[in-house]
Amino acid sequence: MSRYKKQQSPFYQGDLIFIFGVFFIISVVSIYAAGQFGQYGNTDWIQQIVFYLLGAVAITVLLYFDLEQLEKLSLYIFIIGILSLIILKISPESIAPVIKGAKSWFRIGRITIQPSEFMKVGLIMMLASVIGKANPKGVRTLRDDIHLLLKIAGVAVIPVGLILMQDAGTAGICMFIVLVMVFMSGINWKLIAIIAGSGILLISLILLVMINFPDVAKSVGIQDYQIKRVTSWVSASNETQEDSNDSWQVDQAIMAIGSGGILGNGISNLKVYVPESTTDFIFSIIGESFGFIGCAIVVIMFFFLIYRLVVLIDKIHPFNRFASFFCVGYTALIVIHTFQNIGMNIGIMPVTGIPLLFVSYGGSSTLSTLIGFGIVYNASVQLTKYRSYLFNS
């Protein structure tokens, strides 16, 4: 018997490939099912295949960079993201139209690009670089922690502020990511408690103003459609006609999920019309088409991905802090998107236009998610190489 055991290529990460493949199938089949109502035609599922193929190319390209190179690129990617948000803000409506009350997309012909989706990945990369470079030996003082907090605030305030002007949902996602990365950075828990408490107080104050003083909320830049979404969520028993119209799509989503039962009605036998069924409410299509079993599979896949990310965070931290903190931010992104999207589909969270990552239709959302996934895949490959080197040395 040979004394040398054949080693598998470090580029083969079977569990991550499995996750990619399962989400690809779920996404394409669900979008195809949603198209049966004819509200989007029957071509969106084909476009989603193209988005996934482009994402696969992006993942492959990212594997040619080592983690140190990606960290160096984080500043440039972050700056490009900031500039794209500024250009979007000042662009005429001919190339940056207002859609559903928000000026969040560039439109060039039939192509639409949402810069805020890519900004989320750029923000995570930049924060991972800043946090990763702070006190790598673990010896820190209160002054060090405050200095790091100021750096994090300096990185986050501009993109979050620019996004908040038009898209409160995405801005909220970014703020959640920042808070999670701050919490995991090792900063003194007392400072974190102050920040978390201040954040909860601020959010509560904003919600209070939106619900009880909508005119005041509008005067400080909060959009009318955002106020309607919040009021329809918290005041279902005392709805105005406008609020009732806003909550109707949630009622339809709940009805669709309920009609699917245990095994679902199949992709060609959908009976409940759900608006935005390929994007915001794709989970309701899964529920009606594949029932409780289909919904459970989706949730289990997200738990599997999150578990894989948590394991990677722990194992790669001694080798590369940038990769570890990027995985922290990416995990936060997956968690909040999944919780918010599924939550609004079952009526426990307000409608915010947040897609179900990996599953919802959309070029910007799918590509940015897969770019982040590519960096995670790269980190997993590099970890395999590190451990193989240590084992064989």
Curated annotation (Swiss-Prot):
It is found in: Cell membrane. Keywords: Cell membrane, Cell shape, Cell wall biogenesis/degradation, Glycosyltransferase, Membrane, Peptidoglycan synthesis, Transferase, Transmembrane, Transmembrane helix. Changing W105A: Lack of activity. One of its GO terms (cellular component) is cell division site. It catalyses: [GlcNAc-(1->4)-Mur2Ac(oyl-L-Ala-gamma-D-Glu-L-Lys-D-Ala-D-Ala)](n)-di-trans,octa-cis-undecaprenyl diphosphate + beta-D-GlcNAc-(1->4)-Mur2Ac(oyl-L-Ala-gamma-D-Glu-L-Lys-D-Ala-D-Ala)-di-trans,octa-cis-undecaprenyl diphosphate = [GlcNAc-(1->4)-Mur2Ac(oyl-L-Ala-gamma-D-Glu-L-Lys-D-Ala-D-Ala)](n+1)-di-trans,octa-cis-undecaprenyl diphosphate + di-trans,octa-cis-undecaprenyl diphosphate + H(+). It holds the Pfam family FTSW_RODA_SPOVE. Induction: Induced by the ECF sigma factor SigM. Its EC number is 2.4.99.28. Signal peptide: none annotated. InterPro entries: Cell_cycle_FtsW-rel_CS (IPR018365), FtsW/RodA (IPR001182), RodA/MrdB (IPR011923). Peptidoglycan polymerase that is essential for cell wall elongation. Also required for the maintenance of the rod cell shape. Belongs to the SEDS family. MrdB/RodA subfamily. This is Peptidoglycan glycosyltransferase RodA. It comes from Bacillus subtilis (strain 168).
